[in-house]
Design a protein with these regions (language model features):
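N-terminal catalytic or cofactor-binding beta/alpha core of small enzyme domains
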Residues: 1-115, 124-136, 141-149, 158-161
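Acidic/polar active-site rim loop that often engages polyanionic ligands
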Residues: 118
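Glycine-rich phosphate/diphosphate-binding loops and the adjacent beta-loop-alpha structural elements
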Residues: 121
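A cross-taxon signal for low-complexity, glycine/charged-rich
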Residues: 153-155
């Protein structure tokens, strides 16, 4: 099974860099554990080119910082929107998935990991509270990445706060 973990955000805006930091931590862990079926990417934002990057994967986990009212993190399944309209400079995970389906006739399982952030100033450091949330999210994802055959769509598999 081919996996992609893709973090996005701005590491120069404190907790907005949570997705990128998640990728850094998991990439080191995967290398130490010989997990060579996982690809890691990060960027400031998702782009239309990412539709190709996900087209040859079975499972894609996008990770981003969140201002949502959640405890620490939340993993949700992304469905294609059913329509293509590109009106901003950045693409959403649903848009990237829909574009992948349209252009490559592929539909990987796509999840979005929302990691709770608190500080958004122009600094290159993650706040202590967000760091705890990040550490919890990393530990939650490790067994999923080790055994992606886990029933990801079943109740109880997704972390909800």
């Amino acid at each position: 099974m081919q996996l992609l973990v893709y973090g996005y955000g701005n590491p120069g805006r404190q907790d907005d860099g949570l997705g990128i930091e998640l990728v850094n931590k998991l990439e080191d862990w995967a290398a130490e554990n010989g997990l060579d079926n996982i690809e890691f990417e990060n960027n400031y934002q998702l782009n239309i080119e990412d539709a190709e990057a996900i087209s040859n994967k079975d499972l894609v986990i996008f990770a981003d910082a969140s201002k949502e009212d959640i405890e620490d993190f939340y993993l949700s399944k992304i469905d294609g929107s059913g329509k293509l309209s590109f009106t901003t400079h950045a693409a959403s995970p649903a848009y990237v998935l829909e574009l992948c389906k349209e252009l490559f006739q592929k539909e990987p399982l796509v999840l979005l990991l929302h990691i709770k952030g608190y500080e958004w100033e122009f600094k290159e450091e993650i706040s202590p509270g967000a760091q705890k949330n990040l550490d919890r999210a990393v530990e939650y994802l490790k067994p999923i990445l080790e055994d992606p055959s886990l029933p990801l769509g079943s109740p109880g598999q997704f972390k909800s706060c």
